[in-house]
Each structure stands twice: as C-alpha cells, then as structure tokens.
Swiss-Prot record:
Signal peptide: none annotated. The gene is BNIP3L. GO terms for cellular component: endoplasmic reticulum; membrane; mitochondrial outer membrane; mitochondrion; nuclear envelope; nuclear speck; nucleus. Pfam families: BNIP3 (PF06553). A motif (BH3) lies at residues 126-148. It comes from Homo sapiens (Human). Its main location: nucleus. Induces apoptosis. Interacts with viral and cellular anti-apoptosis proteins. Can overcome the suppressors BCL-2 and BCL-XL, although high levels of BCL-XL expression will inhibit apoptosis. Inhibits apoptosis induced by BNIP3. Involved in mitochondrial quality control via its interaction with SPATA18/MIEAP: in response to mitochondrial damage, participates in mitochondrial protein catabolic process (also named MALM) leading to the degradation of damaged proteins inside mitochondria. Residues 69-80 have a biased composition (Basic and acidic residues). It is a single-pass membrane protein. This is BCL2/adenovirus E1B 19 kDa protein-interacting protein 3-like. Residues 42-51, 82-97 have a biased composition (Low complexity). The modification Phosphoserine is found at residues 62, 117-118, 120, 166. Keywords: Apoptosis, Endoplasmic reticulum, Host-virus interaction, Membrane, Mitochondrion, Mitochondrion outer membrane, Nucleus, Phosphoprotein, Transmembrane, Transmembrane helix.
Length: 219
C-alpha cells in the first residue's frame, strides 16, 4: 500500500503575527530625521492651510514645490551667502588694520606736506629774486631819468696855463731892492764866487797829480 503524505497548511495567525513583527522591526525611514518630509499632495495642502491659519508652525515645503523651483532658489541663496562670507573674509584679511591705515595716511600727508613746503620755499626764493630784479631795473630807470643833463656853460672863458717860475738872480729880492751894487747882493755874490774858485782850484790840483804820477812811473 502506498501512502501519500499531505502537508498541512500553515496557520493563519502565525502569518499575521510575522507581518506584525516585521512591521515593528522595520527601521523608520531616513526622511523623517531630516528637515525635508515628503507628504502626499492633498494632505500637504490641508496641513499648509491649517498651519497658515494657526500661524504657529513652520512651513514645510512639499516634494512638488521642491521640484517646481524652490530647490534652485535655495541653492542660489546658499551660493550667494557663501560668496558674500568669502568676500568678507578676504576683505578682512586683505584690508590693513585701522592703525596701519592711519599710519599710511599720516606718512602720505607728511610726504605731501614736505613736497608742498619745499615747493613753497622755492617759489618764495624765486619771487624774491624777481622782485629784486624788478627793483634794480626800476632804480636804474629812475636814476637814469633823474640824472642831471650835461648842459654846457653859457660863456666860455679861455685861460692860459700858468708858467713855471724859473730861478734867477734878477728876480731875487736883493736885485729888486738895490741892484748889482747893493749890500745884500754883494753879501750873496762874493762868498759864492770865492767858494766856486776854491772848488775849481782844488779840482785842478787833484787832476794834475793824477796825470803826473803815471808819467813818472814810466821813466
């Protein structure tokens, strides 16, 4: 005899229990922990209206609004904010401190003031030179205009030059008073005549002696 084994069907309550256990053991979806929640269209609209009326809950964008362009706007806003923050950081890094900026401005002002002072001194010196030159030219013109003119005299008087007085016995005081035979004339004339004769006699004797000595030595 052949026997046929027939397996009994599994109990239904066990399947239901297994389904419940599987549902309980499944982890919650990752979307619930994030800030974005996907909700059905109708339920999301209803919740949005309710939240708008109450005014106390935050607006949670739906998947349709994200796909319709909200995500692009959010990305653009984030990009702009990141660009602004980076530009601020670079500007803070590149821009000098207020003390350095003040020092640079002070140095620039000192340099410009020195340049202006040197230029002003040069201009003052040049101005003084020009004023002195103008004064000299004005003085020369005034001197030339105020000088006396060379006016010739009205009458010409011709005068002969004075002759030099020659020394002579005739114009002496003795000759004028008594002539040749006056006592004053004789007092001057006789001594001078005697002295002249004595000098002539002495000179003749001296010359004769000098001439006689070489002739005697030759013999």
């Amino acid at each position: 005899m052949s026997s046929h084994l027939v397996e009994p069907p599994p109990p239904l309550h066990n399947n239901n229990n297994n389904c419940e256990e599987n549902e309980q053991s499944l982890p919650p979806p990752a979307g619930l922990n994030s800030s974005w929640v996907e909700l059905p269209m109708n339920s999301s609209n209803g919740n949005d209206n309710g939240n708008g009326k109450n005014g106390g809950l935050e607006h949670v964008p739906s998947s349709s609004s994200i796909h319709n362009g909200d995500m692009e706007k959010i990305l653009l806003d984030a990009q702009h904010e990141s660009g602004q923050s980076s530009s601020r950081g670079s500007s803070h890094c590149d821009s000098p401190s207020p003390q350095e900026d003040g020092q640079i401005m002070f140095d620039v002002e000192m340099h410009t003031s020195r340049d202006h002072s040197s230029q002003s001194e040069e201009e003052v010196v040049e101005g003084e030179k020009e004023v002195e030159a103008l004064k000299k030219s004005a003085d020369w013109v005034s001197d030339w205009s105020s000088r006396p003119e060379n006016i010739p005299p009205k009458e010409f008087h011709f005068r002969h030059p004075k002759r030099s007085v020659s020394l002579s016995m005739r114009k002496s005081g003795a000759m004028k008073k008594g002539g040749i035979f006056s006592a004053e004339f004789l007092k001057v004339f006789i001594p001078s005549l005697f002295l002249s004769h004595v000098l002539a006699l002495g000179l003749g004797i001296y010359i004769g002696k000098r001439l006689s000595t070489p002739s005697a030595s030759t013999y």
